[in-house]
Amino acid sequence: MNLENILPKDGPPLDEVTKYIEKYKNDLIVIKYGGNVLIDRNVFNNFITDLSVLNKLGLATVVIHGGGPRIKRELEKSNIQSKFIRGLRVTDKHIINIVESVLIDFNSDIVNSLKNKGTSAISLHTKRNNVIKTLSLIHI
């Protein structure tokens, strides 16, 4: 692997990068990407570039993303007021449809942007992968 062709010119020294590649080459790197960051397209594009570099370096990543600001905006468009208990959104059937739609949209944006950079990426979400099961809570 020719690191000079993968890494940004203004990036860290090659010996530093090599040390971390060796350290994490067999690990799964989990990245939490907040919904606030998704609002700024320049930050988003930088994030996609960084993920693409990690992929080209042979590092395995999983992105867990949010969508809070856009969820809030979509709920407001529908005149729906969210209720929060201890920082957690109380979600009924109508709200979950909006939340799910927003998150799947963000998910697709991330995956498609990575693929456009030549990076292998797959999407995992509730509509296609049955990754989440929920139960109604009577008391929190």
Annotate each language-model stretch with its function.
Residues 1-138:
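Nucleotide/pyrophosphate-binding catalytic subdomain
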